[in-house]
Amino acid sequence: MTVVDRVTAADSSAPQTPLAEVASQFLPRIRDLARKMELDRRLDDDLVEDMEAAGLFSVIVPKRWGGAGLGPHELNEVMETVARGDVSTAWVTGFYNFHNWFLCRFPLEVQEELYAGRASVRCAAILSSPGTTERIGDQLRVNGRWGYATGMLHASHALVPVTIDDGLFWVIVPREKLEIIDDWDVAAMSATESVTIVAKDTVIPETWAMPFAKMMSATDHAGMFHGEEVMRLPFSALTSAISSLYVGALDAAVEISRERLNSASGVNSPPRIERPHARVRWVNAFQTARVMHMVRDHATQEAIEIARRGTPQTLEEEASRGLHGGMILRTVRETLRDLVDGNGSSGYRSDNHLRRMSADIAMLSTHAVHGEYDVMMDRYARWLLGMGLAPDDPGARMT
C-alpha cells in the first residue's frame, strides 16, 4: 500500500468503528490468554499481530502513515479498555503507541523509511543510563546496555538513550543490530517482555538521533509537517494514558468482584452479598473507580489546555498533574488489594485474574519513571511550595 493509498483510506468518509470499541472486541481473547502469557513471559504472537492490524498500536500515529491520528482522550480509552483484559498487554500497547509518536517527530526521510508499508512501528524505548556514541562521518557508532526494553520481543526497533556531545539523545536502532538478553523473570508484569538489550559497535545514520528534549517538546521537533494536533502537544499531554491503565484494571476488578458477590467463601459462610461488610467493600471500590475516571479525565484536559496555551508548564503545574497520576496509582493499588482480600483464599490462585491485576499494579507503583510514590510526592510538595528543583531531581523530565 502506498502513502497515497493509506491517506485515502484514513480519510474515508465511511463510518469508522471507535478504537475503544475495537479494543473491547479483544477482551475475551486477552483474558483467555493472560495466564499463558504470564507463564511464557511474553505476549501471544498472533494477538500482537491482530491488535496491530486492528490499529491499536497506531492510535496517535498521523493519518499520513495510515494511523488514526487521534489524541490523548482516545488513547486513554484504548488503554483503559485493554487493561480490563490484562495489565501487561495494556502496558505494551501503551508503549507501542507512545513510541510511534516519538518516531513521528524525526525528519520526514526517516519516517518514510520506518513507515514504508505499515501504519505502526513496534518499537521499544528505554530511559536509563545512556550509552556512548562515536561519530564516523555522517554516522554514529553506538555502544550500550539497557534494561527494561518493554515489548522488545515483538519489536522491530528500539529507541535507546545515548550521549552525543555531552547531550542526552534517543537513537533508533533496528532489532537486528541489537543483542537481546532474555532476563525478564519477574513475579508481576511478566508478559511485558521488558528484557535487556545490548548494542556493540552498532552503526546507524546520524539522522536517526534526536535530542531527548526535542522528543518531549510540543513543537521543537522535525515532525511538524503532520497536521494532527497530537503532533503539536508535549509528551506530558499523553501521560494520562498510563493512569488509564490503572483505571481500566480497577474497572475490571469491580466487575469481577460484583460477579463473585453471590458466591460463598467457606463451608459455613453465607454468600458475600448477604454480608454488609462485603457489600460495603464492593461499593467503595465501585465509587472509587468512578472518581478515578473523573480525576483522569480532568488531568488529561488540563494538560491539553496547558499545551494549547503555547508556553511551557510551570513546575507547579507539573507537580499538580503529577499528583493526579500518583493519586490514581496509589488509590487503585490499595483498592485492588482490598478486593483481593475480600475474595477469600481463591483470590490467591495462580490463575486468578484479580490476583494478577493486583500484583501487576503493585509492581508498577515501584516503576522508576511512573511510580516511586514517596520520591515523587516529596518532589511535588517541594515544587508546589515554591522550593524549586533540588540537585537530585531529574534533569531530563517527560514534560
Describe each PLM feature range.
Residues S24, G248, V283-R290, G322, ...:
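Generic structural signal for well-ordered, non-transmembrane alpha-helical segments
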Residues V48-E49, P270-H277, E305-G322, S345-M363:
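Charge-rich, acidic-biased intrinsically disordered regions
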Residues M1-E21, Q25, G395-T399:
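Basic/polar N-terminal segments that are highly enriched at the extreme N-terminus
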Residues N343-T399:
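Glycine-rich phosphate/cofactor-binding loops in nucleotide/flavin-utilizing enzymes
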Residues D45-A53, F57-A155:
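Glycine-rich flavin
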Residues Y148-D185, E193:
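A short core secondary-structure module
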Residues R31, R35-E38, V291-M327, R337-Y348:
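C-terminal helix-coil-helix/basic helical segment that borders enzyme active sites and/or dimer interfaces
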Residues A188, S194-R290:
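Glycine-rich beta->alpha junctions and the first turn(s) of the following alpha-helix
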